[in-house]
């Protein structure tokens, strides 16, 4: 397990509020150490000043205990203060990322966030300086592990780094709130190729990735969850790129990759929307998404550009990072040696989505040698293995995702349909 981590995304390694909770607990411990130091010092004075007491008490050890408690008080106090400062710096990074995103859709809200940033900077000038340092350090390490090992790096290295640098551009790699797709997608047709009634929903990250379409040629699986109170919700499982061609009947191709990455409507996106509609999803319905590779971009734009309400999206190896809203849980799985994931530019400097959102990161194959394949770290199986590691962790955000699985389990019926889509080629 090389470099395995679960964090809130980018420079944000923990939730600022959680960090403040820790700081307050450390401060409470400091207070108790201070009380203990004062009590020990008082006891030492009393014993020393009282004739005959020193014969029965080791005053040297007592003084050392008091001195140790005093030093521990100072260390705890300093740690609490520095932890609170770090929490402010992390929040500052998040506020800046949110303000930059909202500038496109809600200038007033962006102004309010920048005003909050100004207040934090005025209260403690160290906050913006530390925030800038955090982002700088994140930028330096975000592509760590991406360079393939020798001798593959002689062939693929330049391609991988070109992809990473393209993703680092402010124009690409990030889907901001309110983002829409330009142009018109190629015409597609869809057809159901398999139906089933699963007995239970997925109960874990790995379990959700294992529910990708399995019928021959299927690219989208839609599960409809119906509840006793009449509610319905949908979960879409969308595969990644299926061919390296730049056109043809397969919508999940490099043409769709290029279109989605540059913000244009693609045949694969249109096919996904059509599949959801065919499964019964209507505007305003909750549609949650589990995706791999190219489908991560489809999921991102479903959350910002479609008429569906996307509350949870799980993306493995996505070329883009979505800046989800406060009410949206965004879960990303990224391998630092995955050149496709590198197109996201290393993710976002601030956290994405709701506080319970998280990013799982690791180097998929740190021991790769002569048998290295540039897309090995991008494979779905490798990401399922990463998801299993996350499921086995005790990270509270992974545990909170359990509420999503629990809600799905309350459905009375589950109807699953897998769809195959084809691009309609223009007649000559």
Model-derived features: where do they sit?
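N-terminal secretion-targeting helices of virulence/extracellular proteins
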Residues: 1-114, 120, 428
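Gly/Ala-rich beta-loop-alpha elbow adjacent to hydrolase catalytic centers
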Residues: 290-300
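Alpha/beta hydrolase fold serine-hydrolase catalytic domain that processes acyl esters and thioesters
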Residues: 61, 118-285, 307-428
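Short, hydrophobic/amphipathic alpha-helical packing segments
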Residues: 23, 269, 295-296
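Single, functionally critical "micro-switch" positions that shape active/binding sites
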Residues: 1, 294, 337
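Short secondary-structure boundary segments
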Residues: 29-43, 47, 167-185, 289-291
């Amino acid at each position: 397990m090389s470099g395995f981590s679960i964090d809130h995304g980018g420079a944000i390694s923990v939730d600022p509020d959680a960090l403040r909770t820790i700081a307050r607990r450390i401060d409470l411990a400091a207070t108790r150490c201070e009380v203990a130091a004062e009590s020990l010092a008082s006891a030492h004075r009393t014993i020393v000043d009282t004739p005959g007491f020193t014969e029965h008490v080791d005053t040297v050890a007592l003084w050392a205990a008091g001195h140790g408690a005093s030093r521990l008080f100072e260390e705890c106090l300093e740690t609490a203060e520095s932890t609170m400062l770090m929490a402010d710096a992390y929040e500052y990074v998040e506020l800046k990322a949110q303000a930059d995103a909202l500038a496109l859709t809600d200038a007033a809200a962006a102004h309010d966030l920048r005003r909050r940033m100004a207040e934090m900077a005025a209260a403690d000038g160290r906050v913006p300086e530390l925030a800038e340092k955090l982002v700088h350090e994140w930028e330096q390490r975000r592509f760590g592990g991406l360079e393939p090992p020798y001798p593959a790096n002689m062939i693929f290295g330049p391609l991988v780094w070109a992809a990473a640098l393209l993703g680092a551009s402010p124009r690409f790699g990030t889907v901001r709130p309110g983002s829409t797709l330009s142009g018109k997608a190629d015409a597609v047709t869809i057809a159901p190729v398999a139906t089933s009634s699963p007995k239970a929903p997925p109960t874990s990250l790995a379990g959700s990735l294992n529910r990708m379409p399995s019928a021959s040629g299927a690219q989208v699986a839609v599960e409809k969850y119906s509840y006793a109170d009449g509610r319905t919700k949908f979960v879409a499982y969308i595969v990644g790129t299926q061919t390296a061609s730049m056109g043809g009947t397969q919508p999940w191709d490099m043409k769709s990759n290029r279109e989605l990455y540059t913000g244009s409507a693609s045949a694969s996106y249109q096919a996904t929307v059509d599949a959801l509609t065919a499964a019964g999803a209507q505007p305003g319905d909750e549609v949650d998404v589990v995706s791999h590779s190219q489908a991560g971009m489809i999921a991102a734009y479903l959350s910002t550009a479609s008429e569906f309400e996307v509350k949870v999206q799980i993306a493995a190896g996505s070329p883009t990072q979505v800046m989800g809203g406060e009410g949206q849980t965004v879960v990303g799985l990224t391998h630092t040696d995955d050149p496709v994931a590198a197109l996201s530019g290393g993710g976002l400097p601030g956290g994405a989505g709701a506080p319970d959102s998280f990013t799982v990161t690791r180097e998929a194959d740190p021991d790769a040698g002569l048998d290295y394949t540039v897309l090995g770290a991008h494979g779905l199986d490798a990401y399922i293995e990463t998801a299993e590691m996350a499921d086995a962790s005790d990270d509270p955000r992974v545990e909170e995702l359990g509420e999503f699985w629990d809600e799905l389990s309350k459905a009375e019926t589950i109807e699953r349909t897998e769809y195959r889509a084809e691009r309609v080629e223009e007649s000559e």
